[in-house]
Amino acid sequence: MTGNEARKTFLDYFENQGHRVVRSSSLVPQADPTLLFVNAGMVQFKRVFMGEEKRDYTTATTSQKCVRAGGKHNDLENVGYTARHHTFFEMLGNFSFGDYFKERAIELAWDLLLNGYKLPEDKLSVSVFHEDDEAFSIWKDRIGLAESRIARLGEKDNFWSMGDTGPCGPCSEIYMDRGEKYGCGRPDCAPGCDCDRFMEIWNMVFMQYNRQASGELTPLPHPSIDTGMGLERICAVIQDRDTNYETDLFIPIIRGIEAASGKTYGQAPDMDVCMKVIADHSRAAAFLIGDGVLPSNEGKGYVLRRILRRAIRYGRQLGLTRPFLSRTAGTVFEVMAEPYPELKENASFITNVLENEEVRFSETLDNGLRLLSETLDGMAAKGESVIPGGVIFKLYDTYGFPVDIVRDVVREKMIGLDMEGFDAAMAEQKAKSRSVVDFSKQPEAYRNLSAKGMKTGFVGYAGLAAQATVLALVNGGSELETATAGQEIEIVTDTTPFYGASGGQMGDVGVITADGLEITVTDTIKDPTGLVIHKGQVASGTVKKGQTISLAVDEDRRRATAANHTATHLLHAALGGIVGDHVKQAGSMVSPDRMRFDFTHFSMLDRATLDRIEVFVNDRIRENRAVTISEMSMDQAMEQGATALFEEKYGDTVRVVAVDGVSKELCGGTHAQRTGDIGLFKILSEASVASGVRRIEAVTGAGAVAFVQEQMGILAEAAGMLKESPAALAARIQKLLAESRTMAKEIAGLKTSLATASMEGPKSDDAKTLNGVKVIARTVTADNPAALRDLADRLKDKLGSGVVVLGAAADGKAFLIVSVSRDLTGRFKAGDIVREAAAVVGGKGGGRPDMAQAGGPQPEHLEAAIQKACDMIGKG
């Protein structure tokens, strides 16, 4: 059975048992600031388990993409050195939200393992929480396992908690006995032993308690089930492989690494480690980039960068000196094409990101490894065993070495790392931060509403006004029964025409009214459960919970926002067609006044390309194409070629916005009815916002007209100042610049002549002899180092063999030049002489052995500095 077949067998089995098959969520958690990445199958159901959200199904099954690298759950350093640790893996799971419980969960798992995966029953054993008599009884009496095959383990092994407080419960694990050759040899070896004989393949969590702040466990009203089985592990069992890396999920990638490196897997343990690291990290990198994570120096992007750079370093150990990750990722695309077709669709973009990062790091990798090697050699000579924190930080800051790489290099050398010193050096750098909307701290009123399955019905696609009932009034996090004039207020209603900020589109503004009541709505937001929250101030009257009110959206601002949103879709299509299909949306902001569109690309767009993009968008606007909106299943949308943002969270039914013959995207925002409603599109700027990410800012409609008028006004004003027509302005400016450059050269020549004249015509007797060498040393008139250098060259040419030391003062600064003829550079080094002289004027300097310069803030000591230079020459 292949990996793809094992995944399909699991999902098909539970679908046939009445479970809803739910698509894997993005690796980027949605509205959960407590997690860096999705690291378990239950993450996308977290709010359901906590009773804060209701879904239209009570049982579900998934194959969830997971990453454990960075943060609390970090397997990065173990990858490559163990049989089963991975940064990226798939978690197969089945879930019950208050539906079935222990007995059914155990029966389903056992049936699938025996009859679906055909595992030998006599090789399976289980563990239960030592106090969970119910689970023990089910395994013994219902399943028929002998007591000797049921291990009772403690809280560390068999009790799961979501946190210090909240849902928790005992768990039961199923193990595969791999045989005595993997064991420790002890007669009491059993599940829970630290050896490799008993391999955990499935964990079932029985979520039946709520842990209070006091530590007390109280029963949950609706116990739930959360199970997880690693696809890679079950494949190793089914395919009878010693490690996960020898399954068909990894072997094709390893074969590609063998071909590129000329090494063979299985012949040398250290080379095997390298291949396993590269294979694992290639999978993680491909999926992270596919889900919108890009290499950076903070947060998720830095974890990705660590993964990539660790793979590159291990590639060097295999002799791979040229970029190789794009090739290994290509194999990942092929292996994963069936379950994750979007990965292959994004292939060109993912490989571009990989190649760009690999080239960047390769430029500094060798220098960093050299510094680390020199440090280790120096430590060995001194008998030291801890790498200084300053060195670790320099490797990180200058050479881009994550600490993981340093640890890997010294892994077998019994060398420690001064992490306190590293942390202290890191703390000196300005911490980068980014605000996150933390819906985990939403007011109790909102949690109660969402727990009841309440969602605000949005009717704003069809109209801009509606009547609704007030469900909640909140001020400062506290729920109110009423609010009066002057109070800041948040209002949740059962229905609303107001669009809540999401998907990059800003929320609507407008008014809420009733008899004697008026509320000015200044913003509208949408929380993850579907509640729409209107923020504003009571202008007059009193609003009460349960009251019927009228809501009206500001029509002009909505229309302008809709035009800008449709324009982003046209811009996206233009970028894909003109710049390349590697372009993917990396973010957006849509407001009534302007739009901002972030996209993946690795170089600046020139003026000609931006002009082509503008022409494309404006042509589509003038064609007045229809904008149609339809709802369909996710699978149907993908079949029709709709573009999805894979870092976004989508439900089973999606909304597709299509611009006739131009684009088709999954989008929940508001849009123009026809492209002609946009009016005019004008790009304001294009710039870099991160490595591999560019940003275009633009305006449409009245905003675009205002911008063009402003630019025309500036052009007319500039033309008037130069008494030229706007059409001839560029040529006139070019002429003025050419004249300016010519005059600058003339001025520089005059200054050099003035400096030369100040020497009163150097003659042979101007040079004095010091230490058997002809030396010209004096102050001259020059206002910049360039003039001083030019004069020094002339004087050295006249001397033939000798040393020239010149000094000048200008603008409160001292300048020094030392020039040594080439035949004397073995005796005198210009850089050494000028460095000593520079100290006299309070400055620094340096250069080549034959020419060096310096500057300092104390021109009053210039004569003394020149004398210092002469003294050095005299001592020679």
Curated annotation (Swiss-Prot):
Q: Which residues cross the membrane?
A: none
Q: Which SUPFAM superfamilies match?
A: Class II aaRS and biotin synthetases, Putative anticodon-binding domain of alanyl-tRNA synthetase (AlaRS), ThrRS/AlaRS common domain, Translation proteins
Q: Which GO terms describe its molecular function?
A: alanine-tRNA ligase activity; aminoacyl-tRNA deacylase activity; ATP binding; tRNA binding; zinc ion binding
UniProt keyword Lyase present:
no
Which cell locations does it reside in? Cytoplasm
Question: Which annotated residues bind Zn(2+)?
Answer: H565, H569, C667, H671
Domain of life (superkingdom): Bacteria
**EC number(s) for this protein?**
6.1.1.7
Keywords, ordered alphabetically = Aminoacyl-tRNA synthetase, ATP-binding, Cytoplasm, Ligase, Metal-binding, Nucleotide-binding, Protein biosynthesis, RNA-binding, tRNA-binding, Zinc
Classification via PROSITE patterns: AA_TRNA_LIGASE_II_ALA (PS50860)
The cofactor required is:
Zn(2+)
Q: What class of enzyme is it?
A: ligase
What reaction does this enzyme carry out catalytically?
tRNA(Ala) + L-alanine + ATP = L-alanyl-tRNA(Ala) + AMP + diphosphate
Q: Name one GO biological process term.
A: alanyl-tRNA aminoacylation
Cofactor remark: Binds 1 zinc ion per subunit.
Give the chief site where it resides. Answer: cytoplasm
Quick check: keyword ATP-binding in the entry? yes
Query: Could you name the Gene Ontology cellular component terms for this entry?
Result: cytosol
Pfam families from the UniProt entry: DHHA1 (PF02272), tRNA-synt_2c (PF01411), tRNA_SAD (PF07973)
Q: What's in the domain note?
A: Consists of three domains; the N-terminal catalytic domain, the editing domain and the C-terminal C-Ala domain. The editing domain removes incorrectly charged amino acids, while the C-Ala domain, along with tRNA(Ala), serves as a bridge to cooperatively bring together the editing and aminoacylation centers thus stimulating deacylation of misacylated tRNAs.
Q: What does this protein do?
A: Catalyzes the attachment of alanine to tRNA(Ala) in a two-step reaction: alanine is first activated by ATP to form Ala-AMP and then transferred to the acceptor end of tRNA(Ala). Also edits incorrectly charged Ser-tRNA(Ala) and Gly-tRNA(Ala) via its editing domain.
- Family designation: Belongs to the class-II aminoacyl-tRNA synthetase family.
- Its recorded name reads Alanine--tRNA ligase
Source organism (scientific name): Desulfosudis oleivorans (strain DSM 6200 / JCM 39069 / Hxd3) (Desulfococcus oleovorans)
What taxonomic classification does the UniProt entry list for its organism?
A: Bacteria, Pseudomonadati, Thermodesulfobacteriota, Desulfobacteria, Desulfobacterales
Recorded name of the encoding gene: alaS
